[in-house]
Amino acid sequence: MIEFLLLMLAVFFVWKIFDQNVAETRIAVILPESGDKRWDALINGMKQSAAENNAHMIICNTEEIDGPEVEREFIREQKDNDIDGFIIYPAPGHETENMLKKECGNNPYLLIADSLAVKEGETASPTIQPDYREIGRRLGEQLKTKKQKIGIIADWKMSEAVQAEISGLTEALEGSGSEISWCIYRRKEQNITERMKEETKADALVILDPGVLEEFGEQAEHGKYKGAELYGVGYSLKTVALLDKGNIQGLVVPDGYEIGYKSVKEIAEKIEHKFYKMKGYTTEYQIFSKKDFSMDDDLERFLYSYE
């Protein structure tokens, strides 16, 4: 009996030794402007999932990624570092999908936060992202309560996500008397305020670029912006605070934490089990309106998805 117990203990300790020495899965994460605070919740979700899935994340240090050529260089660099798989925010451009398939090769990759345009009959890469059309529609529902002229400021690249948001916004405004007067697509190093002077006066701005929304909200907070009411998509706690102060009137917050968590879980599963078919997911988002916002009640709801 004692010999049997000693044998079982020996087996247990050997198992623990080998279990602790299992190599971590190495996952490269490629995001545009990777140090930007809009990725905070997403990266928090990734870190939590990585800890649960024995994965090590390498977040590439990037600036703006304005096309597939730039993204290709980051992929090649990480392949030289013996990466097992990639999580990628796809660069704008019709050639991105083909580039990813070619460059990633046998390394699995998963797209996040923005899908790629796919021709009829082709199969898209799995993507984890919110329903951008529905986000646009919900913003439109906040705006259609009164007749007004609306201006749109979108990300500097005309992504599939932005197109879907604008489509949803347009659908929601149909028959309301409100209309979209103009749309500006941000360009690199462009002064948006100066660019807006070329357009007709708007009663409300829908800002689909989180960085620009926060910038305009901060200007309103300090009395430097006194134009149209601000609505848009944001990720940061600062943006929610600006809503609470009345500098922003309507806000949609995608659940970046969920995107990050599920993306690592899926890619880790694929790396461990070669024949596993990765799934795409439609993730959650929060909707806030200044007129019924409560910092006590709604902040907790935001923080739940943020952290």
PLM features per residue range, with description:
Residues 114-120, 210-211, 222-251, 288-292:
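Venus flytrap/periplasmic-binding-protein-like
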Residues 126-151, 235, 239, 255-272:
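Hydrophobic alpha-helical segments within soluble ligand-binding/sensing domains
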Residues 262-307:
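Hinge/cleft segment of the Venus flytrap/periplasmic-binding protein
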Residues 17-42, 59, 126, 149-158:
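Short beta-strand segments enriched in small/hydrophobic residues
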Residues 1-14:
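Hydrophobic membrane-insertion alpha-helices, especially the h-region
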Residues 95-134, 236-244:
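Flexible loop/hinge segments that line or gate small-molecule binding clefts
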Residues 38-53, 135-139, 160-179, 215:
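Short, solvent-exposed amphipathic alpha-helices that sit
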Residues 86-105, 169, 185-240:
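Hydrophobic alpha-helical
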